[in-house]
């Protein structure tokens, strides 16, 4: 985030600098007849990312912008996918993705009043080695797909997700919220990161394509997600 509060002023995020991204990935693809296999690995480092979170501070009783700079992140993982033919257009498909996404620095921050642009506090956000939020870092899929005559196709898939983390409140990971009476255990609990439970969904789809004069394609499809109505997601 380059601007602290783009809707009210033209101030840039303190400590803003060029964000740098370095990465490497490798893939191996194997195809033997209708059998398919793909294996991929990746590693990415991000340096000097900036981020602004806006919220109402109950203690200060004002709407604030929490501007962070110097955020470093690390991403690495492995992905494997395969497709195995079973019989006459029916195939078994599966994929697994495993990754580990972490913050690798303790960024600097400035908390600024939104209305007056007055700096309210500044310091360090202690979240090094915490997990990057909002995306599952482990995911699996297994399903059946069918391609039949007359351009008909159908599929059913079971999806599984795990290692999902809630977005952290960076203010709780600063010295500003600590009290002299707090014990080490209370501080660890305050700064701990919440992890979502694992989740799964079952989905299915069916469709048909029509080719018109070999120049145009008209397709119809129906897809149903979360067939089992799993609400623990």
Regions found by a protein language model. Give the residues of each.
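Residues that define the transmembrane beta-barrel architecture of outer-membrane proteins
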Residues: 20-24, 31-33, 72-76, 134-140, ...
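Residues on the lipid-exposed face of transmembrane beta-strands in outer-membrane beta-barrel proteins
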Residues: 16, 26-30, 78-84, 94, ...
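Outer-membrane beta-barrel domain signature
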Residues: 13-17, 67-71, 129-131, 192-195
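Membrane-embedded beta-barrel scaffold of Gram-negative outer-membrane proteins
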Residues: 15-66, 74-76
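Gram-negative outer-membrane beta-barrel transporters
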Residues: 42-45, 62-170
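Short loop/turn motifs that connect adjacent beta-strands in outer-membrane beta-barrel proteins
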Residues: 34-36, 87-89, 151, 211-218
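C-terminal beta-signal and adjacent terminal beta-strands/loops
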Residues: 46-47, 159-181, 197, 201, ...
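Solvent-exposed loop segments that connect transmembrane elements
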Residues: 1-12, 53-66, 104-128, 170-189
């Amino acid at each position: 985030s380059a601007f602290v509060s783009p809707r009210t002023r033209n101030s840039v995020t303190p400590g803003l600098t060029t964000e740098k991204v370095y990465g490497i990935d490798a893939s191996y693809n194997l195809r033997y007849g209708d059998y398919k296999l793909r294996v991929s690995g990746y590693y990415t480092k991000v340096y000097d990312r900036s981020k602004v979170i806006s919220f109402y501070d109950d203690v200060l009783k004002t709407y604030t912008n929490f501007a962070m700079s110097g955020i470093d992140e690390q991403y690495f993982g492995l992905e494997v996918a395969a497709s195995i033919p079973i019989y006459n257009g029916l195939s078994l498909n599966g994929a697994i993705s495993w990754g580990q996404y972490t913050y690798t620095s303790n960024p600097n921050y400035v908390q600024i009043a939104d209305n007056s642009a007055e700096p309210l506090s500044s310091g360090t956000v202690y979240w090094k080695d915490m997990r990057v939020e909002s995306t599952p870092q482990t995911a699996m899929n297994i399903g059946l797909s069918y391609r039949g005559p007359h351009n008909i196709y159908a599929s059913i898939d079971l999806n599984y997700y795990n290692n999902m983390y809630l977005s952290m409140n960076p203010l709780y990971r600063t010295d500003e919220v600590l009290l002299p009476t707090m014990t080490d255990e209370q501080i660890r609990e305050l700064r701990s990161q919440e992890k979502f439970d694992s989740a799964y969904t079952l989905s299915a789809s069916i469709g048909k394509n029509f080719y018109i004069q070999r120049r145009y394609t008209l397709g119809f499809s129906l897809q149903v997600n979360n067939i089992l109505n799993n609400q623990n997601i």
